[in-house]
Structures are given as structure tokens and as C-alpha cells.
Amino acid sequence: MINKINMSHLKSSDYKERVNALRRWLRGERLNAYVVPTLDPHNSEYLPFRWQTREWLTGFTGSAGLAVVTLEKAALWTDSRYFLQAEEQLAGTGIELMREGMPGTPDVAQWLEATLGEGGVVGFCGECMSKELFDSLFAGLSERIAVRASDNDPFDYLWRDRPDMPRTLLSLFPEEYAGLSAHAKLQAVRAALPAAPGEEKRLFIMNDLSEIAWTLNLRGGDIDFNPLFLAYLLVTDDAATLFTDRHKITEEERAYLTREGVAVDDYKAWQYVARELRTGRVGETCVYLPASVNMAQLEAFEQAAEATDDVRLEVIPSPVPPLRAVKTEAEREGMRAAMLRDGAAMVQFLRWLDEEVPKGLQTELSIDKKLTALRAEQPGFKGLSFPTIAGYAAHGAIGHYEATEETAARLEPRGLLLLDSGAHYDCGTTDITRTVALGPLTEEERRVYTLVLKGHINLARARFPEGTTGLELDLAARYGMWQRGYDFGHGTGHGVGTYLGVHEGPHQIRKNCRACTLVPFADGMTVTDEPGIYVSDRFGVRIENVLLAHEDGATDFGNFLAFETLTLCPIDLRPVAKELLTGEEIAWLNAYHDRVRVALLPLLANVADKAWLEAATRHI
């Protein structure tokens, strides 16, 4: 299932008409503007087809963006990764591109103030507006403009063939891979919730799909690249209820949930919980909502709190991400097993690539298909963990580049190919980037590649005291680049789920990141190590492995941690400028390749693959 809107047959005039149709709806609703974010009711990173409304309305296919339509104007905000793409896709639609972060670009509130007169009313879909986004969008709006959730979703009327809710079946994630039962995880969630000030009962509504899947040891298929399912989860001090489409659940899963102490109800039945609280018959209750709660849910429970003194409402950070971030021993072993399978597929692919490039027949799209096919041959393969980024030459310098039939470059036997890919297996998730030399390189390409490699190695080698955060660790990857006048704009590392989302928090490694100071690294946390340098219009370099933080002894100065590199795949040695590496960096690279060779050789049946691996992991 690939949830992409087929828009290849549409013209800019079609999107102009869709915007005009929304304007007609606005007049009927007595609204002056409507906000269309890139969100679903669960604040998901990847959206089910049904909620790709911004893309349907505007024709802009980037993963980040927000559209606002008024009775006379329309605008779309996106970040620097998508400026060029948005400019091309919005041409002729009448939608103005707002380049976030650029001088002179107003934010949404400023634009609405300048566009709407006094008494203007801005509408939005309450289900598809998180509290976090609402606060950031409208905090600067004056009282002369009103903002309210609309009672009706315009896309139910305008999008005539709008997809239904996905209804893929659920599956169990075995405890042998999870390491903890659902019952044990529910108990951990309860223990992590704030204590009630008195004798009140506690009630927590979970709306993040990856948190629900992790807590219940269940997986689904409602969202591309993520083994998730649409649901809410209610957790009280002594019970739990899963709100989801009952047709997703087989008798096996229903019996399993009953054993774990979880009842099942319809997807939107959480609304009855809010209504029951409003009656005052439930008794004194502390209702905790996560910071990612959507505005429709927040309003429903706010009404309950306003209706009776028995209900106290508080929005809190979800207790689940810190629990999920520390992997159990079973999860760690599962991730190691997934890396072995993925490494074998990568070796087969890289050997094939070396043979194919000189023939001049392969493109960015064709190599993606080949790599996916090789991964699919591995036991327990469940699908890709994100859309593959295969960027040859100048395309490697484009953030989040995704090749299409129109843009896919043909690979030539020279220059660099940046390949960022990953997969889900039944026991774990992978995320790996390799930059590969396809032929002769310039001195600049070799220098940049080696600087990225140095940063990658220095983070992988880091030993650090307990309590160290990702903000502090970020310098390990960037310091050498900074000395040469290079840098990169994205984060250095993110958590990785266990057959869950490839992007997982709350920890991360990133500069200029206040949130990174709040969550120190701990034994059992996974994180990517992915520094890069991107030379605009020429080439890009990124090298990425997944790391596992582990205890590394104690000294008079406290307990220390270090990283185990989980990813097992050769790092291309052909672009390396050895003279730029220190002796310690060379020793790390040789030792890593020894590990890769010993681990992967037994998994390869093809003699040519074995020979390629031996050569690719030679000492330098």
C-alpha cells in the first residue's frame, strides 16, 4: 500500500479551481480564512491517504507545509528543503509561496493580520490541528481576529473521492522481540503519570500511534513506511481501552488484549468518555492529555472540566517516549539481528552497483527498486522504513530528495552517489546512508567525504559521562568540519524504533536544540550518527549508522557511557583521503570493517559477494 495521491494528470488550473471551491465553502460557513496543515488527528509524521488534504488542495507534495486560503488570497509556508519544489508545483495555482525563515517572510499570524480586516474569522479542522501547532500559529494573533474549529470538514464535501479510513488488520509484536508484555508497559505508563493531588482517579488519553503500538505490542499497516494503526488508547489506574476500528482485530488479537487487561471500543468512542465526565457521575478525576493532543479532543475534555468541579484537566508531556527510548535486552538483540539481514542485502546491492554503473543503464529509481528487491529476500522483511533517497551528483545535495520518473538521473561512472535507505524487519528497523564513489572523484569530493567520515567516526567513538545530552554530543561530529569552514543544516542523530517509526524521540543529537538539553543519553538508547556536507548544485556526502548507547564503566568522576555501532555495512574506502585521518580514526575504521566482514561473510552464499566484501573491508 502506497498512500500517494496520483496527481500526474492534473494542471495548475485544477488546483486553482480547488482553492476557489474552498472559498465558496468558506462563504457558506461565514469564515474569512481556512488553515490546512500537514496533519492527521494523531500528529503523525506520515499521513494516511485520507488526511493528505494540503497536498490534494495545493498540488505541493513536500512532507512539510501549511496552506492558508482566504476569500481573496492563498499562501503556502514551507521550509528551505522544499523552496525549489514548491515554486515549481505552485506555479499557476494562484497560491503564493512563503519561504519560512527567510528575511521578509511573515509568519501565519502576521499574514492573517495583514490580510483580514477586523472581525475576520479563521477556521480549521479541530481533529487535524494539534495543540502544539495551534499555539505556535496563533499566539501572535490580535483579538481583532477570531479563530475557531469548524463544525464541518470541508474536504468531506470538496474531495469527492476522498479515501475512507484505512482498515488493515493488526498483528502481534511477539514478547520475545519486545522484551515486556503489554500489561507491564501499561503499568510503567501508570507509574510515570503525575500523581493525583488527592483521591482522584487518573485518566490518560494516548493519541500518538507509535506510542499506542509500542505500549500494546501491536503493529498495523494504516500508514506507509510505519507499522501503525489508527487508534486512541485510554489508560486509567486499573483499566485500559483501545479505541479503533473493530474490523481490524481478529479473534486472536481480541483474546490477547483481554489477557493483557485491555478492552476494545470503536475508534471515536473516546468522545463518550468526555461526555460521561461532563455529567459529574464519574467522580473526581484527573484527566491527563498529551501535548500532541488535537484541538477537537482538547475542547471535548475542556468542556467536561468546565461542566463539573470533579474533573481536573492537565496537558502533559506523554510519559511513553522516555520509556520507549530505552530498549530492552530483547529489543537490542532484535535490532542487531535486523542489522545483520540488512547488511547482507546492502553488500549484495553494492557489489551489483559496482558492476552495473559502467554499463550506463541504471538510474536513481532503478537502483532503489533493486535494493528493495534484495531486502525483500531477507527473512522477516516487512517493508521500507521511509522513502529511499538516492541522489546522484547534484541531487545528493538536495535535502530529502526523492527521485521521480521525471527527475531521476542516470548514473555515470564518475562522481558520488548518496544513498539513504532503511527497512523494517520483524525484529527491528534499520536506517543507513552510504555515499559511494561511482568513478573518478575531484580533490574536493575526496576532502569533503573524508571530513564527513571523520565526524562520523568521532561521534561513534565518543565516551561521555552519564547525564550528557545530544546538544553536547553534536560537537563531536561537527568540530572537524567547522575547522575547515563546513557545516550541515540537519540534525546529527535521531532515535530509531524497534519495528516502529524510523524517527523516534525524545532524545536526539542536534545543535541549537533546547529540547536536546532535556533528555540525557542513557544505557539502551538507539540513535543515528549521520553527519553530512552538501555542496549546492554539485554533490552531497552523508554517512549514517545506527548506534546503541551502553554503560562503559565508572571512574572517580562518575559513570560513563559509550556507543556500540549496530549497523553492519562497509563504508566506501575509495573516496577516503587517508592523509586527513588520524591514527585513531584509521584504527576505528579498520576495526569496524573487521566486525562487518566477520559478521556478514557467513550470510553470503554468492562467491562474488564474498570477494567484494573482503575487498571492501580491507585495512587502509
Where are these regions (language model features)?
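Active-site neighborhoods and metal-handling regions in enzymes and metal-associated proteins
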Residues: 2-620
